[in-house]
């Protein structure tokens, strides 16, 4: 199965067309040649949104002028299906097989595992970044997770607004407390469940990439008790002017041997941990969706030595429906050169 991708007035691409085979495809080229834009366009076609910016900022710029419109077409040449995303004068539309929508319906979305350069800082970055990473993955396997996250964030915001008032109704606070406790427990338990599955696979995956016998694990640090009843008890026992417990405080650590990886592992070892994590996530997604899932890797191998880079590209989980970008590539896999 191959796809034909066409971009018009999309970022730096005026009118660019490329065929993407079903096997691992590596997009190479210098910075500024539009590699990430190709990844973004595919993500847009399958998910109906961009992780980089809003739709208006995607417009191609020539000098000081911005184009009035942009368009992405992605055609599955085997199934003879086409996805078209159009944006013009603030209006966007999604067309799938001649049916047009103002937003891409959930039933029309295709699962995508996205890995971007910022994810390489998972070990050193903030708990927020780590939560966002695992949530992005869970949401691809369980669509209700994102809806519950959105609702949880709204409830958290409203509860904090109420707590900051000099006078508020205890009954109203109780309503927010109940919703907060239930959602926080659900989200944290789901995160713990997936992190535990990943942790059980992490050492073997790391050892395959690194060629070592190092033990690597994940350790979940919940931001609150795991049951809604226990969370409710903590909330009613404290009336701080800010919600200090809950799923918004969840975190997880990478354990390398007996110590936290960011303290004892080398830079290369840390990056290999992340690649092992990504490979596991890809395997889990493929177990659920088969070859339907698409893997997008944006500039993640820049600091790997040659042998680890080859080991990464040779992992079975990346051999089909995977597109990655890199500055340069020398090898046997299919590649596309830009610039």
Would you name each region that the model predicts?
Residues 1-30, 174-294, 303, 307, ...:
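Conserved NTPase motor "head" modules and their coupling/switch loops across ABC/AAA+ ATPases, GTPases
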Residues 35:
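Conserved lysine of the Walker
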Residues 44-129, 138-141, 145, 199, ...:
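Nucleotide-state sensing region of NTPase/ATPase domains
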Residues 115, 121-210, 221-223:
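An accessory alpha-helical subdomain
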Residues 298-300:
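Walker B catalytic acidic pair
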Residues 320-328:
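Structural recognition of the conserved hydrophobic beta-strand(s) that form the central parallel beta-sheet
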Residues 332-339:
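A short helix-turn-beta junction within AAA+ P-loop NTPase domains corresponding to the substrate/partner-engaging
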């Amino acid at each position: 199965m191959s796809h034909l991708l066409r971009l018009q007035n999309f970022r730096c691409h005026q009118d660019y067309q490329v065929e993407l085979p079903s096997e691992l495809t590596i997009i190479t080229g210098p910075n500024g040649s539009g590699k990430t834009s190709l990844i973004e366009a595919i993500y847009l076609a399958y998910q109906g949104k961009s992780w980089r910016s809003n739709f208006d900022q995607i417009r191609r710029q020539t000098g000081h002028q911005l184009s009035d419109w942009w368009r992405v077409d992605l055609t599955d040449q085997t199934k003879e299906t086409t996805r078209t995303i159009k944006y013009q004068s603030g209006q966007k539309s999604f067309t799938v097989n001649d049916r047009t929508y103002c937003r891409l319906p959930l039933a029309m979305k295709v699962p995508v595992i996205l890995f971007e350069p910022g994810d390489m800082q998972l070990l050193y970055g903030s708990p927020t970044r780590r939560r966002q990473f695992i949530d992005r993955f869970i949401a691809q396997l369980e669509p209700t997770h994102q809806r519950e996250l959105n609702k949880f964030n709204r409830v958290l915001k409203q509860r904090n607004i109420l707590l900051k008032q000099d006078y508020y109704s205890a009954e109203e606070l109780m309503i927010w407390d109940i919703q907060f406790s239930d959602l926080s427990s659900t989200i944290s338990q789901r995160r713990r469940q997936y992190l535990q599955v990943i942790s059980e696979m992490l050492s073997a995956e790391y050892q395959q990439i690194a060629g070592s016998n190092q033990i690597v694990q994940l350790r979940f640090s919940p931001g609150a008790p795991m049951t809604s009843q226990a969370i409710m008890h903590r909330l009613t026992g404290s009336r701080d002017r800010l919600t200090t417990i809950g799923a918004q405080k969840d975190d997880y650590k990478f354990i390398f041997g007996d110590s936290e990886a960011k303290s004892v592992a080398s830079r290369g070892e840390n990056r290999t941990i992340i690649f092992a994590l990504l490979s596991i996530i890809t395997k889990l997604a493929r177990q659920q969706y088969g070859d339907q899932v698409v893997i997008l890797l944006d500039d993640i191998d820049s600091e790997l030595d040659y042998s680890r880079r080859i080991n990464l590209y040779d992992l079975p989980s990346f051999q089909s429906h995977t597109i990655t970008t890199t500055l340069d590539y020398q090898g046997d896999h299919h590649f596309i050169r830009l610039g």
